[in-house]
């Protein structure tokens, strides 16, 4: 231990060993140059230290073994106490700190890889957003095309915005539905009137079918013996009809009168002046008639209504 202290004291004095004084200096030079002739099998082990054995630098046998750190700093007599404490604090914590720094560097590498993963996720999110925007643009384009087609079908468009186009289309559809309902009701009324008219007209063919069985010239079931039409006002007329009696004659007379819907019937009277005839008189007001009205035209209207009910005229009317 004393030899170690002497060695450290020599180190602290910063004194250099003068190898020029040593007798083995020439031998060192020869070894470096390679001029030695006889070399033993292990020249290092056979090397004669000589005076170097007593040198202060090679006192301890374990001089090449590293001295423990605690013993080294415990044997520092000339150092300041603060400096010695600082050396003593150098222990495994510093090593662990260094290891932790290395671990942090490694973790930084992991964080960078995680960042790369996050970047990939961000790229995927951006790609999804771009696809969503493209699909939304296509959907809006299709909607615009459909709105333009709808606008071309609707006749009355108030404004060119989307809400106005849809609202006008709804109103137009509702109007078409109301017109369809009205037309259906009109068609139903016409069918009912045609069915009723056709029922009465079927009697004439039946009568014609039965005529061969009655005889060659059977008497007609409905005959107009006389018809007089007189104009009493500008659009007022008086009508007088004489016909034979028979089954269903009186109802047919009134049905022919009801068929004159373009005129207003002011009064009517049905009487029987003789056992074989009926007398029907009535007055018509043609103020509601839109077309030009005169006496010949009125006679044609009345004649047509009677013919539709199956009447026959025996002689020309006046």
UniProtKB/Swiss-Prot annotation:
<keyword id="KW-0805">Transcription regulation</keyword>
<dbReference type="GO" id="GO:0010039">
    <property type="term" value="P:response to iron ion"/>
</dbReference>
<protein>
    <recommendedName>
        <fullName>Transcription factor FER-LIKE IRON DEFICIENCY-INDUCED TRANSCRIPTION FACTOR</fullName>
    </recommendedName>
</protein>
<dbReference type="InterPro" id="IPR036638">
    <property type="entry name" value="HLH_DNA-bd_sf"/>
</dbReference>
<dbReference type="InterPro" id="IPR011598">
    <property type="entry name" value="bHLH_dom"/>
</dbReference>
<feature type="compositionally biased region" description="Basic and acidic residues">
    <location>
        <begin position="121"/>
        <end position="136"/>
    </location>
</feature>
<keyword id="KW-0539">Nucleus</keyword>
<dbReference type="GO" id="GO:0003700">
    <property type="term" value="F:DNA-binding transcription factor activity"/>
</dbReference>
<comment type="function">
    <text>Transcription factor. Essential protein involved in iron uptake responses. Regulates FRO2 at the level of mRNA accumulation and IRT1 at the level of protein accumulation. Confers enhanced iron mobilization responses at low iron supply.</text>
</comment>
<dbReference type="GO" id="GO:0003677">
    <property type="term" value="F:DNA binding"/>
</dbReference>
<keyword id="KW-0804">Transcription</keyword>
<feature type="region of interest" description="Disordered">
    <location>
        <begin position="90"/>
        <end position="138"/>
    </location>
</feature>
<comment type="subunit">
    <text>Homodimer.</text>
</comment>
<dbReference type="GO" id="GO:0006355">
    <property type="term" value="P:regulation of DNA-templated transcription"/>
</dbReference>
<keyword id="KW-0238">DNA-binding</keyword>
<feature type="domain" description="bHLH">
    <location>
        <begin position="127"/>
        <end position="176"/>
    </location>
</feature>
<dbReference type="GO" id="GO:0034756">
    <property type="term" value="P:regulation of iron ion transport"/>
</dbReference>
<feature type="compositionally biased region" description="Acidic residues">
    <location>
        <begin position="100"/>
        <end position="111"/>
    </location>
</feature>
<dbReference type="InterPro" id="IPR051358">
    <property type="entry name" value="TF_AMS/ICE1/BHLH6-like"/>
</dbReference>
<dbReference type="Pfam" id="PF00010">
    <property type="entry name" value="HLH"/>
</dbReference>
<dbReference type="GO" id="GO:0046983">
    <property type="term" value="F:protein dimerization activity"/>
</dbReference>
<dbReference type="GO" id="GO:0005634">
    <property type="term" value="C:nucleus"/>
</dbReference>
């Amino acid at each position: 231990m004393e030899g170690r202290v002497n060695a450290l004291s020599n180190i602290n004095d910063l004194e250099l060993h003068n190898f020029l004084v040593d007798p083995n200096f020439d031998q060192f030079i020869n070894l470096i140059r390679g001029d030695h002739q006889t070399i033993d099998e292990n020249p290092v082990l056979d090397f004669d230290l000589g005076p170097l054995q007593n040198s202060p630098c090679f006192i301890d046998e374990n001089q090449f073994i590293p001295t423990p750190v605690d013993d080294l700093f415990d044997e520092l007599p000339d150092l300041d106490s603060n400096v010695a404490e600082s050396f003593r604090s150098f222990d495994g914590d510093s090593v662990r700190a260094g290891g932790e720094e290395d671990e942090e560097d490694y973790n930084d590498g992991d964080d960078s890889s995680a960042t790369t993963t996050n970047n990939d996720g961000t790229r995927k999110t951006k790609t999804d957003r771009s696809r969503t925007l493209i699909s939304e643009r296509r959907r809006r384009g299709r909607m615009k095309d459909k709105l333009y087609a709808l606008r071309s079908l609707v006749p009355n468009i108030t404004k060119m915005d989307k809400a106005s186009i849809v609202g006008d289309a709804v109103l137009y559809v509702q109007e078409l539905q109301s017109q369809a309902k009205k037309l259906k009701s009109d068609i139903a009324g016409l069918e009912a009137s045609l069915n009723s008219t056709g029922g009465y007209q079927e009697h004439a063919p039946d009568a014609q079918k039965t005529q061969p069985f009655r005889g060659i010239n059977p008497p007609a079931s409905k005959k107009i013996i006389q018809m007089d039409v007189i104009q009493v006002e500008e659009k007022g007329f008086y009508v007088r009809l004489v016909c034979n009696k028979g089954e269903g004659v009186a109802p047919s007379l009134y049905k022919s009168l009801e068929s004159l819907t373009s005129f207003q019937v002011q009064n009517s009277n049905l009487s029987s002046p003789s056992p074989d005839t009926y007398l029907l008189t009535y007055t018509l007001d043609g103020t509601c008639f839109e077309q030009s009205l005169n006496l010949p035209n009125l006679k044609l209207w009345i004649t047509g209504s009677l013919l539709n009910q199956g009447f026959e005229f025996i002689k020309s009317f006046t």
